[in-house]
């Protein structure tokens, strides 16, 4: 680890930005796992905890690094297990979530079990999870559910609040809040709520705000004026239609939260619960506030961020010392974004992460007394930012006159062979101005990449999200095609060299686009896609999904199988005239493997067999780096002969 002052940070950033001899990075370079998934600063400010994948990628270890010396203690919780979501509950105690690698995710995902350890690894325990019986020994834990730390009680070292939801307790299981001693595993139930309740806590750890869901899947908001008081409806005059991201100030009455009044983009508010009033801190009419930035561990906000177009921030309190610190650090990293991620208890040390469209990110610790910064970890240092492609935010108007955002990734200028890459979901997610491994790999091979945040994407408010419902094969596809025409009209794309590629819903879009807009495309690549929408509805109905999940799919996809068949690539295969590549995990349970089989058979019957890649043991997207790298190489070869240098 290296220590340097703020002017040295600026010099280092400038040197890193200088162009160097261009390197052709391998598929393995983009597929390789990072040096650390995440980093968290201890409350004392003396240690950093790093979730570090092993060289073979089969597990994640927790490394405890003493910042002053670099001395490292490696904690292993279980062989071939991953851990994530590192939380310090005391100066010498950490809690992690047991995790597994999830397809299409940039990092491991929790499986709902919590484990604790002291920093020497000598006292480890399962706090929440299922420990099976072994021989005559009965497992101590039999928690069949999902657990998450929701608050660390900073005034009580080692104590935390855990949210627990049962796995097998019906469609709407109770949410139980436990106060847990993370050193001993002792727990005490302090709150129980139905209707999938979620809670916000004041700084004493008292549940004060609660969100549940009615039978129409709309949010219901309640609050508790003080400990022991009854839950009462939160007035819409302060809570609006929806309130989330709430945090209590030190007075345990003032709340900072994101509020949606009538399905518009979320705005940032300061709320006085006792007075029943609120004041707006920040917000835009076209883009939702995505997050607050806070003054230290338990402080008030000094800024908000937006990320639906190019990420930006707005200082809500420019006079704050924290705002000044943030602005000063930002000057040391021009063209990048910087977020505070964790703090020491006294606020003297701050961990921050720096990232951009060309840089996945690096973690630093800044000492406010010495004004020195210490780099703790890079995410993928072998991918040199100066040799990555720029991600350019774009804005255009669709055929209905609606403003849409998107991103264009390419090296250099001028019309290029274009890969159109719709995001998955399709609802409630959106592409961002950030490092995307798929896009950067393709850009390194000479292609431009277009990503469109079509109607139904998140980050623009509930009205924009809902405007895409029941538009899988219509409205959403119109927006993608309008984005392609924008790229052509603005000399960003070679109109004779365009291919569609995507995963999940993006895989569906990749195949339906050349059916609906045959004049635009020369090829299509479907990766773990859905190609028969009526079959998807039938499969999901038999799959044990909850009533709430089924209602959501009916509401967002539609229930008219005839109409859905009309926009399904399997049923429209006669209109699919371009070369196709199909890629799927044999164990995919999200876009069921039957989807791949139906599409492959339809293309074969039509006399236009697809190029294929099927990998046993993989699911909804590939997890193993070697399989991701193999896919990248096959994707490169397919594009090369259809829109690349060897295209006819």
Predicted regions and their residues:
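Conserved hydrophobic/aromatic "anchor" residues
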Residues: 41, 50, 88, 396, ...
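Cap/lid segment of the alpha/beta-hydrolase catalytic domain
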Residues: 382-496, 503-504, 538-543
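Active-site-proximal cap/loop segments of hydrolase catalytic domains
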Residues: 454-648
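Non-catalytic accessory segments flanking enzyme active sites
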Residues: 198-200, 313-412, 437-440, 444, ...
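Beta-propeller folds
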Residues: 7-14, 21-350, 356-359, 366
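Positively charged n-region of N-terminal signal peptides that target proteins for export
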Residues: 1-6
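Flexible loop/turn segments at secondary-structure boundaries
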Residues: 241, 264-266, 288-290, 309-312, ...
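Alpha/beta-hydrolase-fold serine-hydrolase catalytic core, especially in secreted/extracellular enzymes
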Residues: 262-292, 296-300, 304, 321, ...
């Amino acid at each position: 680890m290296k220590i340097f002052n703020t002017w040295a940070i600026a010099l280092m950033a400038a040197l890193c930005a200088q162009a160097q001899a261009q390197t052709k990075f391998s598929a393995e370079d983009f597929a390789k796992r990072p040096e650390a998934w995440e980093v968290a600063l201890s409350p004392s400010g003396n240690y950093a905890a790093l979730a570090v994948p092993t060289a073979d990628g089969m597990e994640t270890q927790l490394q405890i690094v003493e910042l002053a010396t670099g001395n490292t203690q490696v904690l292993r919780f279980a062989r071939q297990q991953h851990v994530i979501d590192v939380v310090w509950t005391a100066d010498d105690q950490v809690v992690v979530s047991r995790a597994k690698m999830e397809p299409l995710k940039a990092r491991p995902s929790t499986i709902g079990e919590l484990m604790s350890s002291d920093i020497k690894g000598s006292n480890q325990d399962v706090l929440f999870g299922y420990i099976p019986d072994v021989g005559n020994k009965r497992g101590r834990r039999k928690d069949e559910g999902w657990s998450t730390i929701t608050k660390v009680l900073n005034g009580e070292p080692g104590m935390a609040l855990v949210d627990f939801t049962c796995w097998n307790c019906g469609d709407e299981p109770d949410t139980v809040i436990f106060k847990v001693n993370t050193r001993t595993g002792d727990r005490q139930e302090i709150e129980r709520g139905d209707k999938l309740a979620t809670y916000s806590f004041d700084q004493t750890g008292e549940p004060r705000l609660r969100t549940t869901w009615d039978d129409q899947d709309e949010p219901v908001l309640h609050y508790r004026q003080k400990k022991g008081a009854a839950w009462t409806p939160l007035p819409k005059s302060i809570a609006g239609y929806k309130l989330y991201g709430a945090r209590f100030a030190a007075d345990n009455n003032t709340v900072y939260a994101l509020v949606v009044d009538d399905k518009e983009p979320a705005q940032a508010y300061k709320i006085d619960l006792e007075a029943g009033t609120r004041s707006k801190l920040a917000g835009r009419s076209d883009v939702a506030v995505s997050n607050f930035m806070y003054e230290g561990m338990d402080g008030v906000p000094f800024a908000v961020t937006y990320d639906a177009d190019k990420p930006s921030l707005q200082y809500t309190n420019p006079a704050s010392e924290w705002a000044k610190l943030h602005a000063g650090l930002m000057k040391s990293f021009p063209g990048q974004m910087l977020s505070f991620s964790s703090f020491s208890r006294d606020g003297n040390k701050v961990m921050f992460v720096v990232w951009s469209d060309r840089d996945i990110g690096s973690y630093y610790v800044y000492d406010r007394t010495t004004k020195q910064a210490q780099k703790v970890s890079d995410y993928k240092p072998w991918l040199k930012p100066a040799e990555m492609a720029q991600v350019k935010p774009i804005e255009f108007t669709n055929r209905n006159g609606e403003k849409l955002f998107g991103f264009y990734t390419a090296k250099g200028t001028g019309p290029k062979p274009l890969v159109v890459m719709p995001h998955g979901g399709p609802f409630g997610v959106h592409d961002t101005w950030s490092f995307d491994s798929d896009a950067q790999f393709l850009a390194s091979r000479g292609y431009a990449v277009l990503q469109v945040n079509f109607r139904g994407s998140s980050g623009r408010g509930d009205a924009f999200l809902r405007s895409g419902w029941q538009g899988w094969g219509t409205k959403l596809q119109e927006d993608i095609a309008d984005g392609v025409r924008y790229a052509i009209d603005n000399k960003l794309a070679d109109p004779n060299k365009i291919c569609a590629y995507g995963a999940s819903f993006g895989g569906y879009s990749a195949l339906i686009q050349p059916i609906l807009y045959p004049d635009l495309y020369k090829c299509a690549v479907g990766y773990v896609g859905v190609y028969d929408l009526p079959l998807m509805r039938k499969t999901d109905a038999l799959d044990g999904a909850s009533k709430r999940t089924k209602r959501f799919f009916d509401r967002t996809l539609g229930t008219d199988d005839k109409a859905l068949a009309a926009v399904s690539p399997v049923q429209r295969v006669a209109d699919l005239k371009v070369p196709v590549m199909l890629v799927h995990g044999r164990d995919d349970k999200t876009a069921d493997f039957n989807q791949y089989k139906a599409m492959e058979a339809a293309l074969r019957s039509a006399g236009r067999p697809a190029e294929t890649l099927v990998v046993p043991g993989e699911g909804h997207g590939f997890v193993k780096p070697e399989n991701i790298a193999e896919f990248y190489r096959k994707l490169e070869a397919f594009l090369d002969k259809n829109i690349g240098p060897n295209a006819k």
